[in-house]
Swiss-Prot record:
Condensation of UDP-2,3-diacylglucosamine and 2,3-diacylglucosamine-1-phosphate to form lipid A disaccharide, a precursor of lipid A, a phosphorylated glycolipid that anchors the lipopolysaccharide to the outer membrane of the cell. One of its GO terms (cellular component) is membrane. The lineage of its organism: Bacteria, Pseudomonadati, Pseudomonadota, Gammaproteobacteria, Vibrionales. Keywords: Glycosyltransferase, Lipid A biosynthesis, Lipid biosynthesis, Lipid metabolism, Transferase. The keyword Lipid metabolism applies. Pathway: Bacterial outer membrane biogenesis; LPS lipid A biosynthesis. The keyword DNA repair does not apply. NCBIfam families: lpxB. This is Lipid-A-disaccharide synthase. Pfam families: LpxB. The gene is lpxB. HAMAP family: LpxB. Its EC number is 2.4.1.182.
């Protein structure tokens, strides 16, 4: 009897859980008995992945913030190395979370396990010498964006451009009225989606300034509604606390649903930088990006980052399509002025550019990623 295909896999946050679930489905379409084990979120577990640790263990952002969790992160890594070296998979796939996964991949590769890193770290943006660590740690990198593959090719590091799963999943035209009906939102008024982050550290930094921003906008737009996507109960509790402390008189619709439906239902979006900014571009909604980290983290990042922009819409376009208000600029007065501007604009040209970029990364990523991994281990 043939031994089933066995894949080690680690995802570190919600976006990685979504990617991992799609990848698992694509592999199982060809190898129904394939086994997956590692660090997973609920979507990956629903596809049959055995979770040795909960994904929340790894979901921490910012250099200073990581230091506080370092002992636990090191313990999780050591236990994963022990498990995978004692029970070697056919291949290990680390999804994003590069500071954790690349170290894990290096250890596993040194033990003779083939390793794939899914989602290129932003080596083109900062700490470019990491490409040599990536080369040492991986047999293959799977990249979302065409310019990422071009960067790896310059250094002869194996990389496949697979496109982006979100670009595949989201139609080029989205239905605002249907999303509003799904979320029971009043279709006769305008809505601002408020997305202060999926991580606890992000919510802690952004909830209050985003709520203050809504307070200012309400003065100018009395009929504007605010709808907030909350990824889990912990984030809901954090937001509710900030709401009661900052502006209890304001009305927010809190939604335990994906950010995607909330953005589609809205006329404009105020969001934390990250994957959700790409998703907002793909659903075709004008946005303002706000982001803050602890001052020491910001000081370090400013000395390392090589790109002009933080949001992928701007990086893909290589121009400032989307307003980014970062750190000391991420204040209610500036945020509200920019949201007011997009609420008062036509935005047709902006949304046309979003659509062109959407099409450029819509490539059936799940299947391309699965094919690349299976090719690496000679299973195609």
């Amino acid at each position: 009897m043939t031994k089933p295909l066995r894949i080690g896999i680690v995802a570190g946050e919600i976006s990685g859980d979504i990617l991992g679930a799609g990848f698992i489905r694509a592999i199982k379409a060809q190898y129904p008995d394939a086994e997956f084990v590692g660090v997973a979120g609920p979507r990956m577990e629903a596809e049959g992945c055995k979770a040795l640790f909960d994904m929340e263990e790894l979901a921490v952002m910012g250099i200073v913030e990581v230091l506080g969790r370092l002992p636990r992160l090191l313990k999780v890594k050591a236990e994963l190395v022990k498990y995978f070296t004692e029970n070697p998979p056919d291949v290990f796939v680390g999804i994003d979370a590069p500071d954790f996964n690349l170290r894990l991949e290096l250890d596993l590769k040194q033990h003779g396990i083939k390793t794939v890193h899914y989602v290129s770290p932003s080596v083109w943006a900062w700490r470019q010498k990491r490409i040599f660590k990536i080369e040492a740690a991986t047999n293959l990198v799977l990249a979302f964006l065409p310019f990422e593959k071009a960067f790896y090719d310059k250094f002869n590091v194996p990389c496949e451009f697979v496109g982006h799963t979100m670009a595949d999943a989201i139609p080029l035209e989205t239905d605002k009225a249907a999303a509003q009906a799904l979320l029971n939102l009043d279709g006769s008024k305008r809505w601002l989606a408020v997305l202060p982050g999926s991580r606890g550290s992000e919510m802690g930094m952004l909830a209050a300034p985003f709520i203050e921003t809504c307070k200012l906008l309400k003065q100018k737009h009395p009929d504007l509604g605010f709808v907030v996507a909350l990824v889990n109960e912990k984030r809901r509790e954090q937001f509710q606390l900030a709401w009661q402390e900052t502006a209890p008189e304001l009305d927010f619709v809190l939604v335990n649903d994906t950010a995607r439906n909330v953005m589609i239902a809205s006329d404009a979006v105020l969001l934390a930088s990250g994957t959700v900014a790409l998703e907002c571009m793909l659903v075709g909604r004008p946005m303002v990006v706000g982001y803050k980290v602890k001052p020491l983290t910001a000081w370090i990042i400013r000395r390392l980052v090589k790109t002009k922009y933080v949001s992928l819409a701007n990086i893909l376009a290589d121009k400032p399509l989307v307003t980014e208000l970062l750190q000391e600029d991420c204040v209610p007065e500036k945020l509200s002025a920019e949201v007011d501007r997009i609420l008062s604009s036509d935005n047709t040209e902006l949304l046309s550019e979003f659509s062109i970029m959407h099409q450029s990364i819509k490539c059936d990523a799940d299947n391309r990623a699965a094919h690349a991994v299976l090719s690496l281990i000679n299973k195609v």
